[in-house]
From Swiss-Prot:
Subunit-structure text: F-type ATPases have 2 components, F(1) - the catalytic core - and F(0) - the membrane proton channel. F(1) has five subunits: alpha(3), beta(3), gamma(1), delta(1), epsilon(1). F(0) has three main subunits: a(1), b(2) and c(10-14). The alpha and beta chains form an alternating ring which encloses part of the gamma chain. F(1) is attached to F(0) by a central stalk formed by the gamma and epsilon chains, while a peripheral stalk is formed by the delta and b chains.
Regions that span the bilayer: 15-35
Protein keywords: ATP synthesis, Cell membrane, CF(0), Hydrogen ion transport, Ion transport, Membrane, Transmembrane, Transmembrane helix, Transport
Protein name per the record: ATP synthase subunit b
Superkingdom in the source lineage: Bacteria
GO cellular component: plasma membrane; proton-transporting ATP synthase complex
């Protein structure tokens, strides 16, 4: 049957002999074997290396993307914490300022009250001194009048003159201060 096929092929090929076909077929098989041994395997190795390289690049890109997302999330969390800390600092500063304001106002009120009390005491002391001085003057004038009355007996009109003179002396003494 092989010969018949070769003969038919030979006839169909218009002058190509069966030996040539077998020779070409044998050469083609040898070429395939050589290509498989020397070219196919290195070509497949290169394709496999390229495939591995691309897969590695994809894996690395995915890892970098995940790391970038992780870093982005960390940065967002840090920003959130920073904002919260800043808000807390502002709130603490506001509270501290309010407390200091209240302390300053309370201190100023206490100082004003102290100054007021000191002024009241000073006024009271000066009033007491003025009253004591006035009592001394009244006492000395009373003694003086009594001694003058005793020295001479005065008429009612003389007594009035004496009292008016005494009042005038007191007014002059009070006005001289």
């Amino acid at each position: 049957m092989w010969k018949a096929n070769v003969w038919v092929l030979g006839e169909a090929a218009h002058g190509i002999s069966g030996g040539t076909i077998i020779y070409q077929l044998l050469m083609f098989i040898i070429l395939l074997a050589l290509l498989r041994k020397f070219a196919w395997q290195p070509l497949m190795n290169i394709m496999k290396q390229r495939e591995e390289h691309i897969a590695n690049e994809i894996d690395q890109a995915e890892k970098r993307r995940q790391e970038a997302e992780k870093l982005l999330e960390e940065q967002r969390e840090l920003m959130k914490q920073s904002r919260q800390e800043a808000q807390a600092l502002i709130e603490n500063a506001r509270k501290l300022a309010e407390e200091q304001k209240e302390q300053i106002v309370a201190s100023a009120r206490a100082e004003a009250e102290r100054v007021k009390e000191v002024a009241k005491k000073e006024i009271e002391r000066e009033k007491e001194q003025a009253m004591a001085a006035l009592r001394e003057q009244v006492a000395s004038l009373s003694v003086l009048i009594a001694s003058k009355v005793i020295e001479k007996e005065l008429t009612e009109q003389d007594q009035r003159k004496l009292i008016e003179a005494y009042i005038k002396d007191v007014q002059e003494a009070g006005g001289a201060r």
